[in-house]
A protein has these predicted regions:
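Auxiliary Fe-S-binding modules of radical SAM enzymes
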Residues: 1-19, 65, 72, 188-259
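N-terminal [4Fe-4S]-dependent radical SAM core
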Residues: 1-41, 46-58, 69, 73-79
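Generic detector of contiguous secondary-structure segments
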Residues: 6-7, 51, 86-89, 163-175
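Short hydrophobic-acidic sequence motifs that mark active-site Asp/Glu residues
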Residues: 23-25, 83, 143, 181
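Short glycine-centered, acidic/aromatic-flanked micro-motifs in structured strand/loop junctions
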Residues: 28, 86-88, 184, 223
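Conserved Radical SAM active-site core
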Residues: 42-138
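Conserved AdoMet/S-adenosylmethionine-binding subsite of the radical SAM
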Residues: 94-234
Length: 259
């Protein structure tokens, strides 16, 4: 049995994190399964095939109502959230009402906790949709995944479920004009007998070149930390992550490294 995580929907937490402070989670995906355009071998929610959802996506109205209730309660009784984070069982930007939900959340945040930030954790597959792109410009932390720029590695590790053209995605990430945080998972080990080590210069150098083209506000480097559905994956070591982080810093970008 895998100890993978399925998040309640549409609001969960708050979770206290060293990096983010008090984070209230918003899960726009079904609470009984996983809904994603990637099927990453390292996903803490498990493989798509093992978690097919049967419940519907929460509606925009439902998200608004539940979130307002929680924010009202936190306003009266604490704790005050530092950040409202769109995360959960898959890809939040897949929700057909994503843009409207972002508008609502911005409005609720401004009313109850104007100092709180809004973060979206995304795999970047939907940034080509204008309504998603424009909605992401309205959030404080637009966090987009780019594990590598190598198409074969993406097929092996991120396993897109539909058409995925990394160059198209990169061009669209550049179009954020710096209003984007790039998040990259580094690891070693293997999957299906093939190496997944993307910490070598062969992977890091082209990735860093693309980071310099995208010009993000920040780069988040991390490695696997919870149980993964594929047991042959290994964490990238602290020294390795620090070395990559240093290269990003030398290139002129703010960087956060999580071990």
């Amino acid at each position: 049995a895998m100890s993978t995580i399925i998040y309640p929907s549409p609001v969960f937490g708050p979770v206290h994190s060293r990096r983010l402070g008090v984070s209230l989670g918003i899960n726009l995906l079904p609470e009984d399964g996983k809904f994603c355009t990637f099927d990453c071998v390292y996903c803490e929610c498990g493989f798509n095939k093992d978690h097919r959802p049967h419940r519907p996506l929460p509606t925009r109205e439902e998200v608004y109502t539940v979130l307002e209730e929680r924010l009202k309660d936190m306003h009266e009784n604490g704790p005050h959230p530092d950040v409202l984070t769109f995360a959960g069982n898959g890809e939040p930007t897949l929700h057909p009402e994503f843009a409207g939900i972002i508008e609502d959340v911005v409005r609720l945040r401004n009313h109850y906790f104007p100092e709180a930030k809004i973060s979206v954790l995304s795999n970047a597959t939907q940034v080509l949709k204008p309504e998603v792109f424009n909605a992401l410009l309205k959030v404080d932390n637009n966090i987009q995944k780019l594990d590598t720029v190598n198409p074969d590695y993406i097929e092996l590790v991120d396993r897109p479920t539909g058409h995925y053209d990394v160059q198209q995605i990169i061009d669209q990430l550049k179009a954020f004009s710096g209003h984007v945080i790039i998040q990259t998972m580094f690891m070693t080990g293997s999957t299906q007998g093939k190496s997944v080590d993307n910490t070598t210069p062969e992977f890091v150098e082209p990735w860093l070149k693309v980071v310099q083209e995208i010009k993000p506000r920040q780069v988040m480097i991390y490695t696997i930390d919870r149980e993964t559905p594929d047991h042959d994956l290994r964490k990238a070591g602290k020294e390795v992550l620090d070395r990559i982080g240093e290269q990003v810093r030398e290139a002129g970008f703010e960087v956060s490294v999580s071990y």
